[in-house]
């Protein structure tokens, strides 16, 4: 699916996160010290979108994304903590200027449980040092994204 060979381990980690597989994530992190801080070398573009789509969480990944980005999109605060403990960057920027906190407020939760997970994710990211006032390349802050998506997070 993903074309860049050196991204294979990171893609495997991102898939485990998207599948909410905490045991799988832990096992992958044990095998590679640098995986928590690795950045994706390739990602979705207008020409190549389908192969960079994580169906489980309805989310594209972009060049520069980290596992923390995907954990934020998947509303997995425990995984975010584990990644940051192993060097995962809480404020990494992808090619679109988006940081994990931008991803955490994307999408609309379909249940109270998902809404709670999203709130916890946002809280954990801010607690760990994510800047809620940072803008992406379009000048959008995480707060503005949350408002646009009508999120309570």
Predicted regions and their residues:
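Short, intrinsically disordered, charge-balanced linker/junction segments flanking boundaries
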Residues: 125, 133, 138-153
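N-terminal capping/linker segments that flank leucine-rich repeat
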Residues: 1-19, 24-27
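Ankyrin repeat A-helix N-terminal signature
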Residues: 15-20, 58, 70-76, 103-118, ...
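Ankyrin-repeat boundary/"N-cap" motif
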Residues: 6-13, 38-67, 93-110, 135-141
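Ankyrin repeat structural motif
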Residues: 22-29, 76-84, 110-127, 151-153
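Short, charge-rich binding segments
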Residues: 60-61, 70-75, 82, 91-94
